[in-house]
Amino acid sequence: MIKKRIIPCLDVKDGRVVKGIQFKGLRDIGNPVDLAMYYNEAGADELVFLDISKTEEGHSLMLEVIEQTASRLFIPLTVGGGIQSLDDITQLLNHGADKVSLNSSALKNPQLIKQASDKFGRQCICIAIDSYYDPERKAHYCCTHGGKKLTNIKVYDWVQQVEQLGAGELLVTSMGHDGMKQGFDIEHLAKIKSLVNIPIIASGGGGNAQHFVELFDQTDVSAGLAASILHDRETTVQSIKEAIRQGGIAVR
């Protein structure tokens, strides 16, 4: 059995880690390199850096952060946010990222997934999906630009398309659950897992250790992403893992 992973996510804006609720109201959490080292020591299996800077200066600061972090990190580092081209991916991998996460750029140009997968290998390419449930149309749709713009692309169609194009992993954020700490969107995640064979990282809603136990007990996703509850020290990576083990689920 493949062991489940717990992955802290750091949203980085202009060189600082920030966190909001449902993609709004950002507050400063701290220095990304220091936080990355803390999670490295605390038993995290991987780290995700999401660059939400709006400026060129912010994006350049991100490269420095990645380089400083990667030189001291012993776990895989995935970097996403603002990636538009193969050149951007090359730059991130050269600065120490192990994987890249594509979102808006992949929706705009799906061939970028195939080109990136062919050039760097499927294992490097994670597709991030901000999934919004539209109650009027009774379907989940993909959002772009950090969850701000709704597209007409249905999530269940998109996940199958990206797998065929060469994505190695999916990072699915249920926007209605993000930062709410009420539990993961189990039904939605289970449905996505039934449509693809690649690993899924679940994001949005993890409010306590038990939510991660439920996630892994009720779906076959590979990993759970956590931000607020870890940054605010409401729980720790080890406490989450201990609860998962006690639930009879194999975890790294």
Swiss-Prot record:
Query: Which compartment or compartments is the protein found in?
Result: Cytoplasm
Chief location of this protein?
cytoplasm
| Pathway info | Amino-acid biosynthesis; L-histidine biosynthesis; L-histidine from 5-phospho-alpha-D-ribose 1-diphosphate: step 5/9
Per UniProt, the keywords (alphabetical) are: Amino-acid biosynthesis, Cytoplasm, Histidine biosynthesis, Lyase
Active site located where?
D11, D130
Catalyzed reactions per annotation: 5-[(5-phospho-1-deoxy-D-ribulos-1-ylimino)methylamino]-1-(5-phospho-beta-D-ribosyl)imidazole-4-carboxamide + L-glutamine = D-erythro-1-(imidazol-4-yl)glycerol 3-phosphate + 5-amino-1-(5-phospho-beta-D-ribosyl)imidazole-4-carboxamide + L-glutamate + H(+)
The EC number on file is 4.3.2.10
- What is a GO molecular function of this protein? lyase activity
Q: Which GO terms describe its cellular component?
A: cytoplasm
> Keyword Amino-acid biosynthesis: yes or no?
yes
Q: Does the keyword Lyase apply?
A: yes
Q: Name one GO biological process term.
A: L-histidine biosynthetic process
Q: Name one Pfam family in it.
A: His_biosynth
InterPro entries attached here?
Aldolase_TIM (IPR013785), His_biosynth (IPR006062), HisF (IPR004651), IGPS_HisA/HisF (IPR050064), RibuloseP-bd_barrel (IPR011060)
Q: Which cysteines are joined by disulfide bonds?
A: none
Q: Which HAMAP family does the annotation name?
A: HisF
Q: What does this protein do?
A: IGPS catalyzes the conversion of PRFAR and glutamine to IGP, AICAR and glutamate. The HisF subunit catalyzes the cyclization activity that produces IGP and AICAR from PRFAR using the ammonia provided by the HisH subunit.
Q: Tell me how this protein assembles.
A: Heterodimer of HisH and HisF.
Family to which the UniProt record says this protein belongs: Belongs to the HisA/HisF family.
Protein name, please? Imidazole glycerol phosphate synthase subunit HisF
Q: What is the lineage of its organism?
A: Bacteria, Bacillati, Bacillota, Bacilli, Bacillales
